[in-house]
């Protein structure tokens, strides 16, 4: 079983998809149960990966390789290291919990779960692929289910619905993307942004393939024996960076993300913010850092500049939002700036923190979106000024939201605190100005999340929502408890996680530092 564990993790959702095709629509309980099992299997297997990975040996482990096309140099090559294991685990957890968060969907639940499983499997495929062809294949595969899930099961914003003239509201929504968007617009914008970035990354991958002299997409062979001309390294790194940064998303390539968050169903928002956005960071590390260490050292100061705009801009815009999902969406864009800061500092401490923070953010934002979705299902509004006082009717949901808020701003005892602290400590020596701004950004996080908490759960209660009820004992509470407990557990006992991540980060940073010292703060900018 161990030698095929990555295949089990990757293909369990796909097997679930096949089984769902044969289940009649008239049996929704069986549909949901099948989807839950398809999410549970990779979750349990991913926890096994974390504790079975040999940190002392490091490198890629649990590898599987099957030649797909010898002439083209394409192989189905799977493997994980300390960088990918946390993200595989996050993807699996959010798939499993997302199935339960979506338990009450009544509009074509079978089709919804089919696309949800495909989305999760595609993200896992990116994280476990050691062949550039399949890494890109799974990356592109993630776009289609997102488009369908947003366009079919998504929701319009309040501003869009309040505009009487449909033709006018569509035109306004297309120009001003803050409050007047349709779900179709959100789906199309997300698809266009991600596809455009993917094309840029594809150009880089094809140039690597054509100039490496190896006739292979195998990342391990390209890293060890690739002969890409030195004069192309900088260009290829920039193509990889901006191609994949569009999904990360870094400012100014971020505008699709909050729109997509607002339109998506809760479970899709969880996967979107929790793992889909991390495809960008991971792919930059896996392809750009691995193949072009010297170009990484020369150009990552650019990310140190852009990440400040992401942190501050995302936080400020989040503070002034009235839609709960827009607050969380811009919050996610802001927090991804911390990941880029950790990546830009290029030392073991900051990079370990960046990878750990990606996992931590997946859990925290998963809880936030799950709670926002539950409140919306009960009240049919995401308008913060219209809500208030729900804590008296939803004590459990309020408690989970409090844990999520605490995790989001990095309260001790949550895994977010460990990751955030490592990023700030690791980046201080290289980028002190950016680090100070990042610390101030934590204050912004407190401000907009406390404002949202007060507006939704405290203060006078709107009598229009006196009928709402708390989460049901099992279906609604289980996924929230899983995410909260995991965040707190790894916040209390982070050593195993840190050792695994450092096993993947340390040789990568050594290769980059071997190319020369990291440029001073700001680099050439």
Functional labels for PLM-detected ranges:
Residues 1-5, 19-100, 104-114, 218-224, ...:
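Transmembrane helix-loop-helix hairpins at membrane boundaries of multipass inner-membrane proteins
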Residues 2-12, 80-91, 133-145, 233-244, ...:
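Structural signature of hydrophobic alpha-helical transmembrane segments
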Residues 7-22, 36-49, 88-102, 119-120, ...:
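Central hydrophobic cores of alpha-helical transmembrane segments in multi-pass inner-membrane proteins
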Residues 17-27, 95-106, 148-161, 247-262, ...:
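C-terminal ends of transmembrane helices
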Residues 26-28, 111-114, 118, 122-228, ...:
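Alpha-helical multi-pass transmembrane bundles of energy-transducing inner-membrane proteins
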């Amino acid at each position: 079983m161990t030698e095929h564990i990555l295949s089990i993790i990757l293909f369990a959702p796909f097997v679930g998809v096949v089984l769902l095709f044969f289940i009649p629509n008239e049996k929704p309980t069986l549909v949901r149960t099948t989807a839950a099992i398809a999410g549970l299997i990779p979750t349990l297997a991913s926890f096994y990966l974390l504790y079975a990975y040999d940190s002392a040996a490091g490198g890629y482990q649990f590898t599987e390789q099957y030649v797909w096309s010898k002439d083209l140099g394409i192989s189905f090559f799977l493997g994980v290291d300390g960088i990918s294991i946390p993200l595989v685990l996050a993807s699996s957890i959010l798939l499993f919990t997302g199935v339960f968060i979506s338990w009450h969907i009544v509009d074509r639940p079978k089709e919804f779960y089919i696309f949800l499983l495909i989305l999760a499997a595609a993200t896992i495929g990116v994280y476990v692929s050691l062949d550039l062809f399949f890494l890109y294949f799974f990356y592109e595969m993630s776009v289609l289910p997102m488009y369908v899930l947003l366009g079919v099961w998504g929701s319009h914003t309040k501003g869009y619905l309040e505009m009487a003239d449909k033709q006018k509201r569509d035109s306004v929504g297309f120009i001003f993307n803050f409050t007047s968007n349709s779900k179709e617009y959100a789906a199309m914008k997300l698809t266009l942004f991600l596809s455009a970035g993917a094309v840029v990354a594809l150009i880089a991958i094809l140039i690597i393939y054509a100039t490496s002299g190896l006739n292979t997409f195998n990342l391990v062979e390209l890293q060890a024996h690739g002969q890409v001309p030195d004069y192309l390294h900088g260009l290829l790194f920039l193509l990889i960076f901006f191609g994949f940064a569009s999904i990360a998303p870094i400012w100014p390539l971020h505008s699709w993300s909050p729109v997509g968050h607002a339109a998506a169903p809760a479970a899709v928002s969880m996967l979107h913010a929790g793992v889909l956005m991390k495809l960008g960071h991971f792919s930059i590390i896996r392809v750009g850092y691995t193949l072009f260490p010297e170009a990484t050292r020369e150009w990552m100061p650019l990310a140190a500049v852009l990440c400040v705009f992401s942190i501050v801009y995302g936080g400020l815009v989040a503070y002034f939002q009235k839609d709960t999902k827009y607050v969380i969406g811009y919050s996610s864009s802001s927090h991804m700036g911390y990941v880029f800061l950790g990546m830009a500092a290029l030392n073991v401490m900051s990079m370990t923190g960046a990878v750990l923070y990606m996992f931590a953010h997946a859990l925290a934002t998963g809880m936030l979106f799950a709670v926002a979705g539950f409140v919306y299902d009960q009240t049919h509004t995401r308008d913060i000024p219209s809500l208030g006082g729900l804590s008296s009717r939803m004590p459990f949901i309020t408690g989970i939201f409090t844990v999520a808020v605490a995790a989001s701003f990095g309260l001790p005892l949550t895994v977010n605190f460990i990751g955030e602290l490592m990023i700030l400590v690791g980046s201080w020596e290289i980028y002190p100005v950016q680090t100070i701004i990042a610390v101030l950004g934590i204050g912004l996080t407190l401000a907009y999340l406390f404002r949202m908490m007060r507006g939704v759960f405290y203060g006078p209660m709107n009598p229009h929502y006196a009928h709402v009820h708390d989460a049901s004992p099992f279906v609604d509470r289980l996924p929230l408890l899983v995410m909260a407990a995991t965040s707190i557990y790894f916040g209390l006992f982070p050593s195993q996680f840190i050792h695994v991540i450092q096993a993947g980060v340390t040789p990568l940073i050594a290769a980059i530092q071997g190319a020369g010292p990291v440029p001073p703060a700001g680099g050439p900018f």
